[in-house]
């Protein structure tokens, strides 16, 4: 079930405060955040947000196409180790 339209999008208050301060000053330095559930809002366009994936912060440059998505969608948490190698069958005669 999606979030109620009446409530509006969720953005961590401290993250939104940092974005607004940087917009007023005109700065564009990366912002570290652990809030993967925060939604991308138009105020974030042009900023780089370092989203934590459980191991390190992944820098994500925010563009217009990302509006309405969550920050966690752009920072994968799982690493693909590859498929298992085929092992030769023992005792098989060719």
Swiss-Prot record:
GO terms for molecular function: rRNA binding; structural constituent of ribosome. HAMAP family: Ribosomal_uS19 (MF_00531). PROSITE patterns: RIBOSOMAL_S19 (PS00323). It comes from the Bacteria. The lineage of its organism: Bacteria, Thermotogati, Thermotogota, Thermotogae, Kosmotogales. The keyword Glycoprotein does not apply. This is Small ribosomal subunit protein uS19. GO terms for biological process: ribosomal small subunit assembly; translation. Belongs to the universal ribosomal protein uS19 family. Keywords: Ribonucleoprotein, Ribosomal protein, RNA-binding, rRNA-binding.
